């Protein structure tokens, strides 16, 4: 009994041709870790560089590992990162559906087709999945491999539980080409007859990938180098169906250090974690793009890229075989640069929730505080501790008033505060320029360095040795009344 080929011919007719088509195919099992984000980014860049199509496919066949809400995380992360997809579950496309659990019937049909063509067989052996996963399965001992097809189909029709396994050649070799690692040849005898369709009718990850990549017209498959060992079996599936093999791009892992891969289980950060730690999305993307890829040609020395620049510069030949080490200090360096180069209003908007963590008083201007911070913070999470003195003057050490460079000690500081207080009280122009001009003129009148006057005033108003901005900016933001109150507290603290 041969299969009716109408369905398969219709599926083949839907396959788009003529353009580069890439796919990001995550499983909704949690947050987007750095390696996954890099895969998504490289996949998007390959498509955009070639003027091709970027597809989002949700791989949810492993029902036991699914986490509620994880699909929303995928959509949100891609949107925040600007990795727009041309086809996918939410936008549709010519080869829908784009969720694997909705394609169950397709996998079953193609598994049956492969059985008919001799590339797979029904297996009725009661082997546990854990035994198969651990490599204990020995195809040489599997009596089902050589069952006549009519007999096997009769047992299926009788309701006997089964899986469908790939029939790997017992002899010879299989060679596949990877764009990064070149040609790799393996002995067929080292490959197992992997399960393609499980007892519950759902496909395994490896089988669903091959079917979907072909039917969606995927030209370039980007994934981690841990899948190199599975590539020969993918190739044999393509050959058994008579399909063209896509370009493989296996990327080396992102490492925590020279010995350990990054892993959520070991506390390594996901994209969401990095954002919570105060890193900006553009900085994360720029840094992740360079984790294992180097620009070439006229951009070879370039470090900082916009997304359009990355799309223009990206080429597969620049991807390294060597593992990339995730360096949080280097990411911090990138982030600081991005913060400094933001438009002031954009930085103020990004900084506001972090400013308001410690500055609850709405009278204090977010934009004015942000202006002090932009050149002085590396991450957004640096902000709360830097500006907490605006809401409440901390209980500071009198030793703060002593500064050799400014030529101040407790006695000099007391004198400066006592003398500047009436000047502050009399000042009508409480603007940055007004405060600045008054203090500079008064220091000249006193015959002291500017810093000799500014240092004790800043300490009295902020109660910190290190502040974003100097005395003038801090006094302006605090306002006249609060500045005078804090100067009086400083005089009292110094024994005046």
Give the location of each predicted region.
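Charged substrate- and nucleic-acid-binding regions of tRNA-handling and nucleotidyl-transfer enzymes
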Residues: 433-494
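Glycine- and acidic
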Residues: 22-29, 55-60, 216-221, 269, ...
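Glycine-rich phosphate/pyrophosphate-binding loops
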Residues: 48-62, 207-220, 241-255, 468-473, ...
